[in-house]
């Protein structure tokens, strides 16, 4: 009983820490406090560490647009019963906070410690639902962000995990991502009457995703670091020809939720987005990273 009381006291102290952490936006603090209380009540002693990365860790969280990206380090492998409870918790959080998707992974403390020598498999959640398992590698953008920028909510600081991340290998994999995912994404948008074709006309999310997505890679290839979507847009404004400034400003406008568009025609906006992506892909491929 004394152990249980001690654990709850420590847990409540961590909730107090969340409330007073200036790196965490207020509404995210509310969401996390509810989530962690649910988790502590239904799966006590599961968490070994809990961290935020992504836009929050970069100081670029946009309410109504940004996800809440997390990495949960857990004490043990998850049973089917554990997974069922996590599914319900994430479903409830998503229902209560539909504008802030709590997206992240659950990895055991043994696996995250061993991540420096080999890739590990972990389960992950997105938009309130379990998405199955994914392979986590130390030379990935997720681990790089966690290690270098992560916000510690529970457990030791991310830098204490002592990963030896190989930047050139990470850059090489990001370039592979550019020439597979992003090239194919752009091609689908160019295909007449495809779903992506219509998304680029009517879905503001697609314009933002495409334009700022490749801009982030362009920033990383040139500056050997990472930045937020808006940060990448601002960087591009200062480093690409004026021809592209209009579509970049439009993408940042959509990201920030500003109402006034830079375009009168959704067709012109779509065409500029695809042309800009083509330009950035070509410019990025002029750089080479050797593993």
Each predicted region: which residue ranges?
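Catalytic metal-binding acidic patch
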Residues: 54, 59-88, 92, 99-108
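Conserved NTP/Mg2+-binding pocket subregion across the NTase superfamily
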Residues: 20-21, 91-204, 211, 217
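Short, well-ordered alpha-helical packing segments
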Residues: 36, 40, 87-94
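Helical scaffold of the NTase/Pol beta-like nucleotidyltransferase catalytic core
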Residues: 15-51, 81-83, 290-291
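Nucleotidyltransferase catalytic cores
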Residues: 160-291
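Soluble or luminal CAZymes and related metallo-dependent hydrolases
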Residues: 27, 31, 85, 268, ...
């Amino acid at each position: 009983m004394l152990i249980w009381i001690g654990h709850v006291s420590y847990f409540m102290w961590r909730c107090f820490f969340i409330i007073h952490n200036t790196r965490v936006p207020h509404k995210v603090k509310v969401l996390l406090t509810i989530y962690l209380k649910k988790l502590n009540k239904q799966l006590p002693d599961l968490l070994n560490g809990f961290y935020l990365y992504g836009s929050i860790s970069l100081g670029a969280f946009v309410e109504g647009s940004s996800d809440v990206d997390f990495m949960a380090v857990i004490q043990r492998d998850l049973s089917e019963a554990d997974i069922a409870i996590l599914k319900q918790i994430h479903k409830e959080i998503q229902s209560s906070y539909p504008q802030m998707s709590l997206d992240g992974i659950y990895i055991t403390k043994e696996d995250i410690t061993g991540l420096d020598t080999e890739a590990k498999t972990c389960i992950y959640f997105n938009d309130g639902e379990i998405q199955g398992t994914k392979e986590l590698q130390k030379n990935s953008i997720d681990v790089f962000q966690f290690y270098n920028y992560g916000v510690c909510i529970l457990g030791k600081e991310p830098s204490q995990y002592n990963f030896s991340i190989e930047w050139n290998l990470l850059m090489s994999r990001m370039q592979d991502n550019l020439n597979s995912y992003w090239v194919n994404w752009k091609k689908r948008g160019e295909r007449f009457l495809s779903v992506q074709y219509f998304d680029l006309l009517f879905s503001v999310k697609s314009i933002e995703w495409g334009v700022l997505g490749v801009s982030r890679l362009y920033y990383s290839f040139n500056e050997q670091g990472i930045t937020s979507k808006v940060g990448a847009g601002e960087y591009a404004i200062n480093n690409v020809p004026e021809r592209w400034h209009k579509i970049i400003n439009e993408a940042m406008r959509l990201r920030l939720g500003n109402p006034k568009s830079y375009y009168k025609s959704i067709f012109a906006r779509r065409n500029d987005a695809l042309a800009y992506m083509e330009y950035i892909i070509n410019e990025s491929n002029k750089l080479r990273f050797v593993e």
